[in-house]
């Protein structure tokens, strides 16, 4: 396992690009999953998309405080309800804003063994699924932040967008 550099939205245009589906789960993909997990934990994050470490592949890792989830080619297939909560992002350090998300989602993806799995997430986990899958589509949380809720705790960097 190795730590990877986390892309920054101000310097790395890759974050606005759409990721490609994983065609073959091989040793490189499994190593990437391990590296992403280590990188996420090292940065005290709750989720990370492959694009955030510079790889345009549809891969995410999430830890909601109960379990580590590693997903390949995830897709949200159902959404229920609504929540509006504060979000941040490892690629946009020190910036937070309120984002409208579904209260519950159903996600289909491949696991590390290439098996199709279906997961449900509510609350924080639903937000994490949506946030990380947005990354795979080149969408950042600041693109969806509710008006008037964006906060930048980096006093020396007032310009967000």
Where are these regions (language model features)?
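Positively charged
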Residues: 1-161
């Amino acid at each position: 396992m190795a730590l990877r550099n986390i892309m920054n939205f101000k310097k790395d245009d890759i974050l606005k690009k759409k990721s490609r589906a994983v065609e073959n789960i091989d040793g490189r993909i499994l190593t990437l999953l391990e590296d992403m997990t280590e990188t996420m934990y090292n940065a005290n994050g709750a989720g990370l998309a492959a694009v955030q470490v510079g790889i345009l592949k549809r891969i995410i890792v999430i830890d909601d405080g109960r379990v580590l989830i590693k997903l390949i080619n995830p897709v949200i297939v159902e959404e229920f309800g609504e929540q509006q909560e504060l979000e941040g992002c490892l690629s946009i350090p020190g910036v937070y804003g309120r984002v409208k998300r579904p209260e519950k989602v159903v996600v289909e993806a491949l696991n590390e063994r290439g098996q199709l799995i279906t997961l449900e997430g509510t609350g924080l986990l639903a937000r994490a699924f949506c946030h990380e899958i947005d990354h795979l589509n080149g969408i950042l949380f600041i693109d969806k932040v509710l008006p008037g809720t964006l906060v930048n705790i980096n006093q020396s960097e007032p310009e967000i967008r």
